[in-house]
Swiss-Prot record:
Residues 41-54 have a biased composition (Polar residues). It comes from Prochlorococcus marinus (strain MIT 9211). Belongs to the universal ribosomal protein uL4 family. Part of the 50S ribosomal subunit. One of the primary rRNA binding proteins, this protein initially binds near the 5'-end of the 23S rRNA. It is important during the early stages of 50S assembly. It makes multiple contacts with different domains of the 23S rRNA in the assembled 50S subunit and ribosome. Forms part of the polypeptide exit tunnel. This is Large ribosomal subunit protein uL4. GO terms for cellular component: ribonucleoprotein complex; ribosome. One of its GO terms (molecular function) is structural constituent of ribosome. Residues 40-80 are annotated as: Disordered. GO terms for biological process: translation. Residues 60-71 have a biased composition (Basic residues).
Length: 211
């Protein structure tokens, strides 16, 4: 079980929160998280690259030159892979890069990744609810009040990010905001600091706390 400090919008301590999630054994945690990240990255690949083989390239019905008498190596098609404009040998074709992983393993990897970042995590009460219109400066100043370095990558996890928050954050290259239902291993590990809304924390504990 880990104890976390709950901050208000001004960066002052507003209470305490606990996070107790089942994690993988130390001997298997690295391998489990690695497989989860590889799977997530593989699923983001489109797999639409496609080349033409010698049977698909336009042309190729005629013989480039006669079989004998030229002194050159014999060739039977102008679309052989040995000629410019010919087909591609073993080129890429549309395919799926998806990798399988058991649901229990995926959930365990996510819980393990989250608990591994517990020292870089802060809980914020009513994150951004005071904003009435999108203001990037307000988000930057708030992160500074929370003690986050200016050059740090920040992942903000909210129960349901409002349009105001999304528009306030989207112009900050180092900051990313996601919903609690979009929690994933790569983003958890890629960020230097995690900012979790109090309601999002409740959602995470409700969804992942029963395993």
């Amino acid at each position: 079980m880990a104890n976390c400090v709950v901050l208000d919008w001004q960066g002052q301590e507003a209470g305490k929160a606990t996070l107790d999630l089942k994690v993988a054994k130390e001997t298997t945690a690295v391998d489990l998280i690695h497989r989860a990240v590889v799977r997530q990255q593989a699923h983001s690949r489109q797999g639409t690259a496609s080349t033409l083989t010698r049977s698909e390239v336009r042309g190729g019905g005629r013989k480039p030159y006669k079989q004998k008498g030229t002194g050159r190596a014999r060739q039977g098609s102008i679309r052989t892979p040995l000629r410019p404009g010919g087909g591609i040998i073993f080129g890429p074709k549309p395919r799926s890069f998806s990798l399988g992983m058991n649901r229990k393993e995926r959930r365990l990897a996510l819980r393990t990744a989250l608990m591994a970042r517990i020292n870089d995590l802060m809980i914020v009460q009513d994150f951004g609810t005071a904003l009435k219109v999108p203001k990037t400066r307000e988000i930057v100043e708030a992160l500074s009040r929370f003690g986050i370095a200016d050059d740090a990558k920040v992942l903000i996890i909210l129960a349901q990010p409002s349009e105001i928050i999304i528009r306030s954050v989207r112009n900050i290259e180092r900051v990313k905001v996601i919903g609690a239902d979009q929690l994933n291993v790569f983003d958890l590990l890629n960020a230097n600091s995690l900012v979790i809304g109090e309601k999002a924390l409740s959602t995470i504990k409700e969804v992942y706390g029963d395993d």
